[in-house]
Amino acid sequence: LQSPVIMQTTPSTVKYAGLDYYLANVKAAAERAKVPVAIHLDHGSSYGLAMQALRTGYTSIMIDGSHESFEDNIAVTKSVVDACAPSAIPVEAELGKVGGKEDDLDGGDGDGYTDPEQAREFVERTGASSLAVAIGTAHGLYKGEPKLDQERLWEIRQVVSVPLVLHGASGVPDEAVR
């Protein structure tokens, strides 16, 4: 296969291995790779961590302010977008609560689905490059068959122009995502 690769870290990976150590290893591997390699911060938990990733050479950053109020999520996301813009580093944001548990993230029971109108306003006010939405996916293992709110996803797609991201979709059957 000649597919591009995305190497990503979460805040718990950074805490365990250290950002500089991890990045040095990934950069060494990327230099030897015969395909493009992106280095992504997943679920960046703070402005400070996002800036550390930006300074050390990450090629894309996710700031996850979904645990904050709507206005605070907008504020932290816009701050990260503004800081990344001069370097043309794309910023993914999250709106809504993706259920389940992964690393130190606890999305609860997944009942905080993304509201389409809030998604439109959020993207307009922040300038995020992509938006992770909550439509029924969950981090970690599924207890039963995932039930995705396809209609909600369609409604969000109609009012949001940036790419939409589904976290927790690795346990979702391919046909449910198509």
Regions found by a protein language model. Name each.
Residues 1-8, 12, 20-36, 44-166, ...:
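Alpha/beta enzyme core
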Residues 17:
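Metal-cofactor-binding active-site regions of metalloenzymes
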Residues 169:
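Structured beta-strand/loop patches that form or line metal/cofactor-binding pockets in enzymes
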